[in-house]
Amino acid sequence: MGKELYEQHALAKRLFDEANEILGFRITDIMFSGTDEDLKQTKVTQPAIFLHSVVHALCMGDEFQPDMVAGHSLGEFSALVANKVLSFQDGLRLVKTRAFAMQKACELRPSTMAAILNLEDAVV
């Protein structure tokens, strides 16, 4: 996840390396060669998704000229950074705080999520 960007773009490498410092752990190790179990931890998943989305947008440079941006939940942070309303660093710090808080909540009250596809409303 994101390894190709890291290897092919100097800006991506700089941002990924900066993310390792901001997060306090080597997210690149997990994103590029970690286990699914490591990546499924919300304290890793959320920064990884944010990082991949934002790095991709920022590496597009001047090619990325959106008329508008939108995001839902975690995607709101990516949208704000991609549209230069929020800095990469501040966006990642916010996502880190959010992710660690949600990780703690998950540990205090374990739960799970399921997707239900192709069933009639009455069946669900």
Labelled PLM ranges:
Residues K3, Q41, A79, T112-A115:
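Conserved short-loop catalytic and cofactor-binding motifs
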Residues E18, H52-V55, F77, D90, ...:
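Residues within well-formed alpha-helices
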Residues E21-F25, N83-V124:
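Alpha/beta catalytic cores of group-transfer enzymes, especially the acyltransferase/condensing modules
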Residues G34-T35, S73, V95-R98:
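A general structural motif at alpha-helix termini
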Residues H72-V81, V85-L86:
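Glycine-rich nucleophile elbow surrounding the catalytic serine of serine-hydrolase chemistry
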